[in-house]
């Protein structure tokens, strides 16, 4: 389906400003200059036209997948090399939980929900949202460095993925959530 040996960067979510897709596309353009065997997969629905225009120069390295079934999504989690969530706002993200369940290294922002869910995360994978004239901004440079680190350092990426899988088992598996639910109501 994709090129042999391609590194797959996976974004899953709505296509709108709050999810940071525009920053991701800009950062990805920098990544492929240094790691040309990399592909960005964008799964989700929304208005693609803006993002297609943004990615005109790199369209051959981006695959816009659209909305898909949960089973198909799980197949993408299994083949992806990294999950990226450059969101400006998240609460309890099912996408983050699913990515951790599949042992993906994640690149996240320091927005409240994600920081609480993935508190062990290596600092190099956590992007800092900065306020600029009452508007939150994300550093494209920081994001591209994080992406490049994961797609070029397989050993480190595997270790971060293992930490995420452990975090999933310790806090978000069905058994752990059932126990927490029972404890809360007893």
What do these predicted ranges mean?
Residues 3-19, 25-28:
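Conserved donor-binding/catalytic core segment of Leloir-type glycosyltransferases
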Residues 88:
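Aromatic "clamp/platform" in nucleotide-sugar-dependent glycosyltransferases that forms part
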Residues 67-68, 75-80:
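Short alpha-helical donor nucleotide-sugar binding micro-motif in glycosyltransferases
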């Amino acid at each position: 389906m994709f090129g042999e040996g391609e590194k797959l960067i996976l974004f899953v979510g709505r296509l709108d400003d709050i999810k940071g897709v525009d920053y991701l596309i800009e950062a990805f353009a920098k990544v492929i200059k240094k790691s040309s065997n990399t592909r960005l997969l964008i799964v989700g629905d929304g208005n693609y036209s803006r993002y297609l225009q943004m990615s005109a120069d790199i369209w051959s390295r981006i695959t816009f997948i659209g909305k898909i079934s949960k089973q198909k999504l799980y197949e993408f989690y299994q083949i992806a090399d990294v999950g990226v969530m450059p969101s400006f706002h998240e609460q309890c993200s099912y996408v983050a939980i699913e990515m951790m369940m599949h042992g993906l290294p994640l690149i996240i922002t320091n927005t409240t929900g994600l920081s609480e869910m993935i508190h062990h995360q290596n600092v190099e994978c956590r992007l800092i949202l900065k306020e600029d004239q009452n508007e939150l901004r994300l550093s494209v440079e920081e994001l591209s460095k994080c992406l490049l680190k994961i797609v070029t350092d397989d050993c480190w990426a595997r270790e971060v993925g293992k930490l995420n899988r452990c975090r999933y088992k310790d806090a978000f598996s069905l058994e752990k959530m059932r126990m927490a639910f029972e404890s809360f109501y007893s």
